[in-house]
């Protein structure tokens, strides 16, 4: 019975507590809660009695809410708030009037288009027993000077950004101060005045904002190009060297002016003394041909016509003048060659027997000549120039793809041959003609240097091998890629035929050149290599052949040069070989 009585008492107390709480909730006036920063929440844990309340649907925590009112600045015009209005705010009533824009926020900076272009709007007046003092747009709004609306906590603006860049509303790029980087890029720079407003102590700080070097360092200014680094100064122009120091005993035309030409030169028709040729006045000449210097330079192919006065223009050799229309006409060349013919004194045609035998063609393969072409008397080989020329025949590698190695003894043999040839009347007359045409100077050394350069300068015919020269090609022979080339001298042909290495196959054409020589066009094979067409002088001296080829190469390179020997007209064909800035003799032979 005691237990039942206690249970009944406990049940009654529980029901009484439950009804009391329900009645309290029904009578409570609900209002909009304040912001979190204006609400202070105190939580109290329930006692053991709260467990029974929770069991019957009641919460066991008691929440006490107190509003922290911001400090209110009173003014003489402020209206005194009644205790009733301060303790219990009236219920929130939403007006049915149309909503009005509140305008920009009070802390909107001047860089924002919303804060700079229009005046702030006044918010609608709520029914309240208090009246706040309006703030002027020119002064920063301070929420602590306005009383809060009923049921709302006071407005607290956002804290300013920690750096000096304006991040509000994207007000567009601001003009950057001088030296802070490129204009129109990056974030806009805020003004140098920053205002910090807090809810409790109000502090206004004004000062220069330090430049943030860590975030956006200023770009360096453009560097002007340095003349020393980018555009090095050019060296001072060198003064042209003066005239070379004259060498005793060897006067040179480069050191003395040439005689003034008086009239065009025509080669004399009467032979002069072989020891002392009669000098001819220096003729006038044009610039249709580039003369070949004697020291290391070269000439290009001449393109004037094969007739009389060609019309091309090229550079004239330094130190010479040009006043005519042609360096040399065809008639002048023929007159010169006739003069050379009269000076030919070492012809060996009388000591040679020519056995032409049967005719052939270049396309034939049959042997139309079972016997040798030439039968040479030993007296024909006793001429001083022929003796020195024969010493050069064994100095060459005939394969053009094998490098030539000139020994000192071979170089001496070349010089001895040149000295012997340059001393002959034929070669001296040819050099005198070239001197009159401005191709060479009066200095005899330049004549020799010209002949040596044209005929004995080594060059390459392919694969980078220095294995050819003009003399080797014309007066001996060469083999290029299995083809025989050259072989245009009768002395070497006679030696090879005597040794059984030259097999004569027949002739195609022949022509006598007066009584001092012959020209034959033949077909032959040499050590198993066939040459279908080959033209060669027979019986002429080395100096005459060398003089004809040199003059024609200087005046009519890369085409047929008109020649007349003993009133027999034919042509001389020369080909130039360009190598390392020089025009050298690639080939030369008579053409009938």
UniProtKB/Swiss-Prot annotation:
GO biological process, one term: mRNA destabilization
Cross-referenced InterPro entries: ENDOU, EndoU-like, EndoU_C
EC id: 3.1.-.-, 4.6.1.-
Region listing for Disordered, in residue ranges: 83-329
Signal sequence annotation: 1-24
Biased composition annotated in UniProt, kind: Low complexity: 134-144, 188-209, 268-294
Domain EndoU: 329-592
Location in the cell: Endoplasmic reticulum lumen; Secreted
Biased composition (Polar residues): 109-120
Reported cofactor(s): Mn(2+)
Disruption of the gene: reported phenotype: Viable without any behavioral or developmental defects but adults have reduced lifespan. From 3 weeks of age onwards male and female adults have reduced triacylglycerol levels and lipid droplets are reduced in size. Adult flies show faster consumption of lipid stores upon starvation. RNAi-mediated knockdown in fat body tissue results in adults with smaller lipid droplets in fat body cells.
Domain of life of the source: Eukaryota
Active site per database record: 473, 488, 531
Comp. bias intervals (Pro residues): 234-249, 258-267
Catalysis: reaction(s): a ribonucleotidyl-ribonucleotide-RNA + H2O = a 3'-end 3'-phospho-ribonucleotide-RNA + a 5'-end dephospho-ribonucleoside-RNA + H(+)
A molecular-function term among this protein's GO annotations: RNA endonuclease activity
Stretches that traverse the bilayer: none
Tissue distribution of the protein: Predominantly expressed in head. Expressed in fat body cells.
Coiled coil ranges: none
Sorted UniProt keywords: Endonuclease, Endoplasmic reticulum, Hydrolase, Lyase, Manganese, Metal-binding, Nuclease, RNA-binding, Secreted, Signal
CC per GO annotation: endoplasmic reticulum; endoplasmic reticulum lumen; extracellular region
Family membership: Belongs to the ENDOU family.
Domain notes: The signal peptide is not required for the protein's role in lipid droplet maturation. The EndoU domain is essential for the protein's role in lipid droplet maturation.
Record text on subunit structure and interactions: Monomer.
Function: Endoribonuclease that cleaves single-stranded RNAs; unlike its paralog EndoU it does not appear to preferentially cleave at uridylates and releases linear products instead of products that have 2'-3'-cyclic phosphate termini. Preferentially cleaves single stranded RNA at sites with AU, UC and poly-U sites cleaved less efficiently. Targets mRNAs encoding proteins involved in lipid metabolism, particularly those involved in lipolysis, to regulate their expression.
UniProt-recorded name of the protein: Endoribonuclease Arlr
Source organism (scientific name): Drosophila melanogaster (Fruit fly)
């Amino acid at each position: 019975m005691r237990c039942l009585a206690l249970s009944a008492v406990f049940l009654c107390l529980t029901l009484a507590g439950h009804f009391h709480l329900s009645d309290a909730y029904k009578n409570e006036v609900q209002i909009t809660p304040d912001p979190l920063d204006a609400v202070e929440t105190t939580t109290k844990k329930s006692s053991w009695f709260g467990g029974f309340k929770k069991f019957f649907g009641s919460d066991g925590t008691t929440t006490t809410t107190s509003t922290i009112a911001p400090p209110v600045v009173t003014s003489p015009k402020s209206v005194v708030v009644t205790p009733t209005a301060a303790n219990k705010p009236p219920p929130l009533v939403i007006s049915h009037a149309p909503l009005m824009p509140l305008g920009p926020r009070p802390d909107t900076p001047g860089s924002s288009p919303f804060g700079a272009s229009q005046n702030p709007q006044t918010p609608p007046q709520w029914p309240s027993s208090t009246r706040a003092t309006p703030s002027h747009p020119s002064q920063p709004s301070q929420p602590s000077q306005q009383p809060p609306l009923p049921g709302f906590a006071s407005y607290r603006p956002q804290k300013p950004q920690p750096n000096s860049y304006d991040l509000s509303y994207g007000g567009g790029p601001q003009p950057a101060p001088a030296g802070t980087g490129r204009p129109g890029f990056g974030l806009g720079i805020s003004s140098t005045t920053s205002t910090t407003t807090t809810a409790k102590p109000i502090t206004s700080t004004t000062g220069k904002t330090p430049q943030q070097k860590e975030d956006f360092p200023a770009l360096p200014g453009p560097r002007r190009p340095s003349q020393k680094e980018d555009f090095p100064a050019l060296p001072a122009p060198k003064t042209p060297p003066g005239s070379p120091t004259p060498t005793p005993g060897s006067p040179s035309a480069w050191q003395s002016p040439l005689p003034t030409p008086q009239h065009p030169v025509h080669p004399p028709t009467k032979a002069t003394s072989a020891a002392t040729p009669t000098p001819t006045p220096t003729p006038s000449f044009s610039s249709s041909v580039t003369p070949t210097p004697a020291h290391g330079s070269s000439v290009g192919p001449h393109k004037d016509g094969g007739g009389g006065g060609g019309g091309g223009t090229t550079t004239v050799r330094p130190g010479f003048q040009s006043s005519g229309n042609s360096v040399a006409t065809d008639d002048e060349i023929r007159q010169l060659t006739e003069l050379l013919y009269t000076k030919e004194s070492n012809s060996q045609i009388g000591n040679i027997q020519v056995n032409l035998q049967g005719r052939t063609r270049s396309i034939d393969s049959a042997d139309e000549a079972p016997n040798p072409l030439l039968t040479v008397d030993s007296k024909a080989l006793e001429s001083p120039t022929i003796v020195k020329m024969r010493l050069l025949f064994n100095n060459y590698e005939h394969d053009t793809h094998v490098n030539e190695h000139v020994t000192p003894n071979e170089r001496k043999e070349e010089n001895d041959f040149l000295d012997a040839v340059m001393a002959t009347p034929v070669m001296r007359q040819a050099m005198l003609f070239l001197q009159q045409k401005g191709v060479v100077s009066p200095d005899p050394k330049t004549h020799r240097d010209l002949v040596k350069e044209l005929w004995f300068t080594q060059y390459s015919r392919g694969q980078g091998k220095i294995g050819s020269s003009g003399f080797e090609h014309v007066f001996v022979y060469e083999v290029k890629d299995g083809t025989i080339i050259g072989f245009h001298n009768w002395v070497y042909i006679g030696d090879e035929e005597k040794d059984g290495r030259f097999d004569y196959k027949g002739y195609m054409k022949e022509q006598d050149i007066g009584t001092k020589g012959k020209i034959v066009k033949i077909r032959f094979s040499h050590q198993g290599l066939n040459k279908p067409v080959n033209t060669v002088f027979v019986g002429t001296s080395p100096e005459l052949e060398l003089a004809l080829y040199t003059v024609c190469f200087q005046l009519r390179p890369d085409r047929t040069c008109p020649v007349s020997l003993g009133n027999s007209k034919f042509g001389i064909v020369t080909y130039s070989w360009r190598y390392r800035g020089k025009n050298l003799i690639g080939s030369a032979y008579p053409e009938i």
